UniProtKB/Swiss-Prot annotation:
Its cofactor is Mg(2+). There is a cross-link at residues 49, 61 (Glycyl lysine isopeptide (Lys-Gly) (interchain with G-Cter in ubiquitin)). A motif (Switch 1) lies at residues 34-48. It catalyses: GTP + H2O = GDP + phosphate + H(+). It comes from Sus scrofa. This is Ras-related protein Rab-1A. SMART domains: ARF (SM00177), RAB (SM00175), RAN (SM00176), RAS (SM00173), RHO (SM00174). Phosphorylated by CDK1 kinase during mitosis. The modification N-acetylserine is found at residue 2. GO terms for molecular function: G protein activity; GTP binding; GTPase activity. Mg(2+) binds at residues 25, 43, 66. A motif (Switch 2) lies at residues 66-83.
Length: 205
């Protein structure tokens, strides 16, 4: 085997975006490490994890970037939209405001990401059924009107977390077609480590 061949057939760069506290980091932890913590600390700037999956007999390396949802980091994260193959917009099903802000996040995607980037809408914390305020049908109809897939997830119970990332990978692979080369993602020398900062308030479910 030639040493030029990478260990994967595709490399997809994915972004997790959405308001602070909706559970983006918990979704990433569940998918990449299969762990969950009630008292997760706020992501500062950008952090990423890598997981390799198998899909239709192909090996796909997912580089998943977890971006801070705080307003003050909007300018930092704008550069991370570039080169992304897929973007997962996350809201909290117990927080109407986070769902209302999805439109704003979609505007960010239109402004900064490549035109044909794949999108996925995720309503997290679906295990909190008694606190749920965003109806599944409402969110599904909204996603359908935009032509993007929608799933409700629970990072706590691992509900649909795997499915969300696999759906995104399958959509990107379908769009790129059989002629796509391994890699695809832009090479970047920027390395930003997230620094733990204690966050007052509840966990991220």
């Amino acid at each position: 085997m030639s040493s030029m061949n990478p260990e994967y057939d595709y490399l997809f760069k994915l972004l997790l975006i959405g308001d602070s506290g909706v559970g983006k980091s918990c979704l990433l932890l569940r998918f990449a490490d299969d762990t969950y913590t009630e008292s997760y600390i706020s992501t500062i700037g950008v952090d990423f994890k890598i997981r390799t999956i198998e899909l239709d007999g192909k090996t796909i390396k997912l580089q998943i970037w977890d971006t801070a949802g705080q307003e003050r980091f909007r300018t930092i994260t704008s550069s991370y939209y570039r080169g992304a193959h897929g973007i997962i917009v996350v809201y909290d099903v117990t927080d109407q405001g986070s769902f209302n802000n999805v439109k704003q996040w979609l505007q960010e995607i239109d402004r900064y990401a490549s035109e044909n980037v794949n999108k996925l809408l995720v309503g997290n914390k679906c295990d909190l059924t008694t606190k749920k305020v965003v109806d599944y049908t409402t969110a599904k109809e909204f996603a359908d009107s935009l032509g993007i897939p929608f799933l409700e997830t629970s990072a706590k119970n691992a509900t649909n977390v795997e499915q969300s990332f696999m759906t995104m990978a399958a959509e990107i692979k379908k769009r790129m077609g059989p002629g796509a080369t391994a890699g695809g993602a832009e090479k970047s020398n920027v390395k930003i480590q997230s620094t733990p900062v204690k966050q007052s308030g509840g966990g991220c479910c």
